[in-house]
């Protein structure tokens, strides 16, 4: 093998290795038609709510709105994701969905799912909240593990 061929092969092997490093495991989800129970992954509706829990509030004391929950055992193939419990997302029902400040949303993780739950007394939406909230309804969620390209915002080498 000539020096030029060795250099070309090295570039090829390095690019192939970098391409593999730039792949990341991820999970896609789709909506299901059936309405899930409070113990299942879902978007909207009534969340899993342990009897000792409180509805999260924003910096003004206004209740946040339930967006989504993930039953962690439904997620397969992500080593860094919890294997059990429930992960919930709560947001403000404003035009920014609570993303304008760090107190307008909450992510809550329950490490165990208990049968001792209550139905939270969620206050009714006012007209503005109805207009801005991104959900209308309740949906089950199915998860599919996949591999996608990692973000290209960091260049490790130039070949």
Map each language-model feature to its residues:
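Preference for intrinsically disordered or flexible, low-complexity segments
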Residues: 1-157
């Amino acid at each position: 093998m000539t020096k030029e061929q060795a250099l070309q092969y090295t570039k090829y092997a390095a690019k192939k290795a970098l391409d593999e490093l730039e792949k990341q495991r991820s999970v896609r989800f789709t909506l299901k038609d059936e309405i899930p129970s409070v113990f299942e992954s879902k978007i909207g509706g009534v969340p899993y709510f342990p009897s000792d829990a409180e509805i999260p509030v924003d910096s003004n004391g206004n209740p946040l709105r339930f967006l989504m929950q993930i039953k962690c055992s439904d997620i397969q193939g992500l080593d860094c994701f919890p294997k059990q419990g429930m992960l919930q997302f709560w947001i403000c029902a404003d035009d920014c969905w609570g993303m304008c400040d760090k107190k307008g949303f909450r992510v809550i993780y329950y490490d165990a799912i208990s049968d001792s739950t209550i139905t939270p007394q969620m206050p009714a939406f006012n007209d503005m909240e109805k207009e801005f909230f991104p959900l209308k309804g309740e949906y089950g969620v199915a998860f599919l593990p996949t591999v996608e390209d990692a973000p290209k915002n960091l260049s490790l080498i130039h070949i």
